[in-house]
């Protein structure tokens, strides 16, 4: 729970807070004439004051006696006040922004703290990458609570990453002050099949009395889900059906309702609350992955609260889901999540609950944003050289690098990955493709494109070959180093020449995302920090991503956030079929499968 303010622990300031509450000492700040959203009792308390001292709340109620000559008084003028919003599961890397720029982007929207899982940068740079992001966040007002990446690689043995994290590494990071728990345990097969590695990293977290966050994407909610939760996992953001979320809540697991740039699960999973008469204390709203144009256009948790209200969740319940519920999930409600005495003075002023319009944001008793604009400074952080040079490809990539051979054949029946727009899953399809000069041809008329994943961390020269369906592209290619979770170089296209151009464009700029057609680069987003992030401002990044979106449309793709859907093609912990730099993976059986179906 670190930021630029370094608020003192409660035990250091308890005497002062008690004195301020009784009027023996003046408060540093007092908010008057507010309508308090009390998340402890789910009610609005009219005409309430809040006295703040030493970055913490001293009193809630009538605070006239707490005002002295030097007290800063903020007149809420009848506006609502709520605890500052907490995002319980977020990959900052998905915003393509540095941590400091991410903070500048979300704090004015009422976000005061995030539970960051930096497993993207960890897959590239190891724990050094985690350290870099922690240091980047220390110069911001945003509270950066960090979880140690649990699955680096995501599924051991199926891909090549830049680093690996084991139980010994987790044990060491649990000593870091900034670490509050374990990042999403995606290797649920390892938990269910009792592997030493999976249970080892969970065990080291439990020994430290910290929170284990989860990732259980199976539709099975019986013995498998029970076994997963029994291992110590406390929450999960992978519910895509209402029954999934409800089953988790009934078993005492915090169900995190996701609404990001590409994954719009809230419409369905909100029914777990709206269609069932259940307590919502085990429900949390999170963003998971949010892109720069979404942050600029829609906002952050303020937008997600609004979406929850639109889906029928009561406004006060929605606010509980980004405040006290989240804090309790991470066993931090003694510090965060409510406007009550002793807690950190993280408060948002809301003009109305329907539109969730944030007018002021206070963090640790400091006014940090007003009317959508940050009012405090943020220190710039320069990422070290190893973070800025992460493209290590062994062989020069040419059109011939994309050949998929099938000798003495005219046609082959091929396993094809079919994407599901706006969903994380894929389908395995079997499609007959033509062979010309012993080379298997993609078939844009059937919406079947060629896909190749090149290892980019250790110059191993390994590459996985396959085909994908569902993007709708008739001509051109796209490439990305944002390719979960190993973040190798993923290239998809209709022809080898454009695919080579796309790959080499990213190698030259240090990583990123690109779309090309007929030998021309139509859209490019350079991401020089680990091939994942940029140090450019939000507005500039949003413009580049918007241009890339337009480039995707120009080459024939109309799905929402196509680069995010593309980025999940190598993620071998999600069903059904995936492609890593080692080959095709059946993610139901967790085994490699051949590209061709033998007759």
Swiss-Prot record:
GO aspect biological process, one term: adenine catabolic process
Keyword line: Hydrolase, Manganese
CDD domains: AdeC
Record Pfam families: Adenine_deam_C, Amidohydro_1
HAMAP family assigned to the protein according to its UniProt record, in alphabetical order: Adenine_deamin (MF_01518)
Entry EC no(s): 3.5.4.2
Source organism: Clostridium botulinum (strain 657 / Type Ba4)
GO MF, any single term: adenine deaminase activity
Protein name: Adenine deaminase
Protein family per UniProt: Belongs to the metallo-dependent hydrolases superfamily. Adenine deaminase family.
CC cofactor: Mn(2+)
Catalytic activity: adenine + H2O + H(+) = hypoxanthine + NH4(+)
């Amino acid at each position: 729970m670190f930021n630029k303010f370094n608020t003192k622990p409660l035990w250091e300031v308890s005497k002062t807070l008690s004195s301020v509450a009784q009027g023996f000492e003046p408060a540093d700040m007092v908010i008057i004439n507010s309508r308090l959203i009390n998340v402890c009792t789910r009610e609005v308390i009219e005409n309430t004051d809040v006295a703040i001292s030493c970055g913490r709340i001293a009193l809630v109620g009538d605070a006239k006696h707490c005002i002295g000559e030097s007290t800063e008084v903020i007149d809420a003028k009848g506006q609502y006040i709520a605890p500052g919003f907490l995002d319980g599961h977020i990959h900052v890397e998905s915003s393509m922004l540095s941590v400091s720029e991410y903070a500048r982007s979300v704090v004015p929207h009422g976000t005061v703290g995030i539970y960051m899982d930096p497993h993207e940068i960890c897959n590239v740079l190891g724990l050094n990458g985690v350290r870099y992001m922690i240091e980047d966040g220390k110069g911001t007002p945003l509270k950066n609570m960090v979880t140690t990446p649990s699955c680096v690689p995501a599924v051991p043995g199926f891909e090549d990453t830049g680093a690996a994290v084991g139980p010994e590494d987790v044990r060491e990071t649990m000593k870091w002050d900034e670490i509050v728990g374990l990042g999403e345990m995606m290797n649920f097969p390892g938990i269910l099949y009792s592997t030493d590695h999976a249970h080892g990293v969970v065990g080291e977290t439990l020994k430290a009395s910290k929170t284990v966050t989860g990732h259980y994407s199976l539709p099975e909610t019986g013995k498998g889900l029970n076994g997963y939760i029994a291992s110590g996992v406390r929450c999960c953001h992978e519910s895509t059906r209402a029954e999934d979320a409800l089953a988790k809540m009934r078993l005492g697991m915090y169900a995190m309702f996701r609404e990001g740039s590409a994954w719009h699960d809230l419409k369905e999973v909100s029914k777990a609350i709206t269609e069932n008469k259940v307590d919502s204390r085990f429900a949390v709203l999170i963003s998971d992955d949010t892109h720069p144009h979404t942050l600029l256009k829609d906002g952050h948790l303020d937008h997600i609260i609004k979406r929850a209200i639109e889906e029928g969740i009561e406004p006060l319940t929605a606010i509980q889901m980004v405040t006290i519920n989240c804090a309790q999930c991470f066993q931090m409600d003694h510090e965060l999540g409510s406007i009550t005495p002793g807690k950190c003075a993280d408060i948002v002023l809301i003009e109305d609950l329907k539109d969730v319009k944030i007018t002021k944001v206070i963090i640790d008793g400091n006014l940090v944003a007003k009317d959508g604009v940050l009012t405090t400074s943020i220190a710039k952080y320069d990422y070290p050289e190893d973070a800025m040079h992460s493209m290590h490809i062994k062989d020069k990539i040419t059109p011939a690098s994309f050949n998929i051979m099938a000798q003495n054949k005219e046609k082959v029946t091929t396993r094809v990955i079919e994407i599901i727009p706006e969903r994380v899953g894929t389908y395995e399809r079997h499609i007959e493709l033509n062979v010309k000069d012993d080379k298997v041809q993609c078939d844009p008329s059937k919406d079947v494109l060629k896909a190749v994943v090149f290892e980019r961390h250790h110059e191993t020269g390994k590459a996985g070959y396959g085909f994908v369906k569902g993007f709708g592209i008739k001509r051109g290619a796209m490439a990305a180093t944002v390719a979960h979770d190993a973040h190798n170089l993923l290239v998809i296209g209709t022809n080898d020449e454009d695919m080579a151009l796309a790959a080499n464009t990213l190698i030259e700029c240090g990583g990123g995302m690109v779309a090309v057609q007929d030998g021309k680069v139509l859209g490019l987003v350079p991401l020089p920090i680990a091939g994942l992030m940029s140090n450019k401002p939000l507005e500039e990044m949003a413009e580049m991503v918007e241009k890339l979106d337009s480039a995707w449309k120009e080459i024939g793709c109309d799905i929402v956030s196509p680069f995010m859907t593309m980025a999940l093609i190598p993620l071998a912990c999600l069903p059904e079929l995936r492609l890593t730099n080692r080959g095709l993976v059946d993610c139901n059986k967790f085994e490699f499968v051949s590209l061709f179906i033998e007759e």
